[in-house]
Design a protein with these regions (language model features):
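Terminal peptide-recognition signature
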Residues: 20, 24, 39, 57, ...
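Short loop-to-helix capping motifs
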Residues: 24, 49, 204-205, 254
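Conserved CoA-thioester-binding segment of acyl-CoA-metabolizing enzymes
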Residues: 1-60, 93
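Crotonase-fold acyl-CoA enzyme core
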Residues: 94-209, 232, 240-241, 246-249, ...
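Glycine- (often His-adjacent) and acidic-residue-rich active-site loop
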Residues: 3, 48-51, 59-94, 110, ...
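Short, charged, surface-exposed hinge/linker loops at domain edges
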Residues: 213-222
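Structural motif
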Residues: 17-21, 56-58, 77, 103-105, ...
Length: 262
């Protein structure tokens, strides 16, 4: 598979392991239009890639991903918003079509869609300085692009609602304690830890490994089918609210937003 058309994503092959890195380090890998579009294509390509047996997903620089780029949101036209949500659905659906094991190496902050990408991975390692959360509500929108699916799946409804409704971030240690991620490792050992496990998977009985992943993910796929369209529709509605506009303006003006519930 040729990944040379990707620029906001960096793809590096180590034998049968494909390392995919979000590649906007100057913006903490915040997801803008170009990166969002590439994310909506990459997983379908990986699913068809016969040279790749395992994927490691990480971020360039000091962040995994700071989530959606607020500067992108402030200028969205209605047609662009429609395209965004079409892509958002495709990202999650295509992620679940990837039969190869995917390991997230969370090397720094992972928030919003950034956190969702990590949490939909099969094994999640986080650096000891990483923080993880889904602060959609803090910009006045529903956690619609996968957060409402994956957080309850990993930590149960009660804990998921606490963190999704507040938008609070967790330390890597706290995320490990509640079962949101697999393991915290020292930052300098993160990639080595992820690649070592990836190589073990790649050298294993790949058909059995893939089949086991597909089987476990049947319940997750059913949850996506139940929740995702509703959560995305509710998130899209929020883009037209006064609260969302206030959150964007407050971000631009570097102040706390004053929400009115409208």
């Amino acid at each position: 598979m040729d990944y040379s058309r990707y620029h906001s994503l960096s793809c590096e092959r180590q034998d049968q392991v494909l390392i995919v890195s979000l590649n906007r380090p100057e913006a903490l890998n915040a997801i803008n239009a170009a990166l969002h579009t590439e994310l909506s294509h990459i997983f379908a390509d990986i699913a068809l890639d016969q040279e790749t047996n395992v994927v490691v997903l990480t971020g360039k620089g000091r962040a995994f991903s700071a989530g959606g780029d607020i500067k992108w949101f402030q200028d969205l036209t209605p047609p662009q918003l429609e395209a965004l949500f079409t892509e958002a659905r495709k990202i999650i659906v295509d992620l679940l079509e990837v039969q190869q094991p995917m390991i997230a190496a969370v090397n720094g902050p992972a928030t919003g869609l950034g956190a969702t990408l990590a949490l939909f991975s099969d094994v999640i390692f986080a650096a000891d300085n990483a923080r993880i959360g889904d602060p959609h509500v803090r910009i006045g929108v529903v956690a619609g692009d996968g957060g409402a699916v994956i957080w309850p799946w990993l930590v149960g409804a009660a804990r998921a609602k606490e963190f999704l409704l507040t938008g609070d971030l967790l330390t890597a240690a706290e995320a490990e304690r509640i079962g949101l991620i697999n393991r915290v490792v020292p930052a300098e050992q993160l990639m080595a830890t992820a690649v070592t496990l990836a190589q073990r998977f790649a050298a294993g009985p790949t058909q059995a490994i893939r089949g086991t992943k597909v089987s476990v993910n049947k319940i997750l796929r059913a949850t996506v089918n139940l929740v995702l369209d509703t959560s995305l529709a509710l998130e899209k509605q929020c883009f037209f609210t006064a609260d969302h506009r206030e959150a964007i303006q407050a971000f631009i003006e570097k102040r706390e937003p004053k929400f009115t519930g409208r």
